[in-house]
């Protein structure tokens, strides 16, 4: 138990600093070097696809079995037996809840792109691609150099409108930070509620990769909006702290060791599993495999990410 607690605390610290660095680095060091930007875009895109494979294994090889085990424990306490796929249904409820919250946020914002969109990493694709926005960073004021080419008029689809994010003021950026924060709490909950070391490690790898890339997207949007470094640091700390907050909540629920805490753990893990489904299929795979460049290489990284985490499930930590 002590080793498990130490592992979760290390996960809290690790994810926090990964996200903080990912958020602030673009604000501090982005340069108008098109060749370097193109290379960075390709590397981030491949890392993102690798993260998609990691999340597939995390969801189906680690998190889903954990939800099944926890539900079985809860049902056995009440002497209830059923063949109904409760774990799968609970995860789908979490998935639909995440989609609903996303669309609710977008309805109030009167926008259509997904609220946690890694389209940032698909920037600079060829003309005629299905990505709507291929220019996630366009300089403001003294930062007048374009990091990526401007999007073509023929592009369509859903994407995070980073080009427009800074125009009306800070409200859109704040709404993005709020959405990212709410999303991150559930991912942190999934980590904090785990009872086995190998599941903690596999979840940590998936969350760390995905959330770091999301933090980079946030950093690019803050750089696009010419946010001062001090204000950017405040926003970055806020978002970066949400995973540790979720882990802390999960630890508190798990340490209660009561029937109510077991029920809460099963429900929250199932709902968090739905969030992972949303991230995997509607954020990562839908965006990355939509691109017409490096498709086979992305599939290779997708399989590689899955294989790495699927193998880690069999390890005992």
Curated annotation (Swiss-Prot):
Coiled coil: none
Taxonomy of the source species: Eukaryota, Metazoa, Chordata, Craniata, Vertebrata
Disruption phenotype: Knockout mice are viable and fertile and under normal growth conditions exhibit no obvious phenotypic abnormalities, and are only slightly more susceptible to the effects of dietary zinc deficiency.
Reaction catalysis annotation: Zn(2+)(in) = Zn(2+)(out)
UniProt name for this protein: Zinc transporter ZIP3
Places the protein is found: Cell membrane; Apical cell membrane
Reported tissue expression: Highly expressed in the testes. Highly expressed in dentate gyrus granule cells of the hippocampus. Expressed in the mammary gland.
InterPro entries: ZIP
A single BP term in Gene Ontology: zinc ion transmembrane transport
Domain of life: Eukaryota
GO CC annotations on file: apical plasma membrane; hippocampal mossy fiber to CA3 synapse; plasma membrane
Record membrane topology: Multi-pass membrane protein
Cytoplasmic side: 25-42, 107-172, 221-232, 287-294
Keyword vocabulary terms for this entry: Cell membrane, Ion transport, Membrane, Phosphoprotein, Transmembrane, Transmembrane helix, Transport, Zinc, Zinc transport
Record family assignment: Belongs to the ZIP transporter (TC 2.A.5) family.
Extracellular side: 1-3, 64-85, 194-199, 254-265, 316-317
Species: Mus musculus
TM ranges: 4-24, 43-63, 86-106, 173-193, 200-220, 233-253, 266-286, 295-315
Physiological role: Transporter for the divalent cation Zn(2+). Mediates the influx of Zn(2+) into cells from extracellular space. Controls Zn(2+) accumulation into dentate gyrus granule cells in the hippocampus. Mediates Zn(2+) reuptake from the secreted milk within the alveolar lumen.
Phosphoserine: residues carrying this PTM: 125, 129
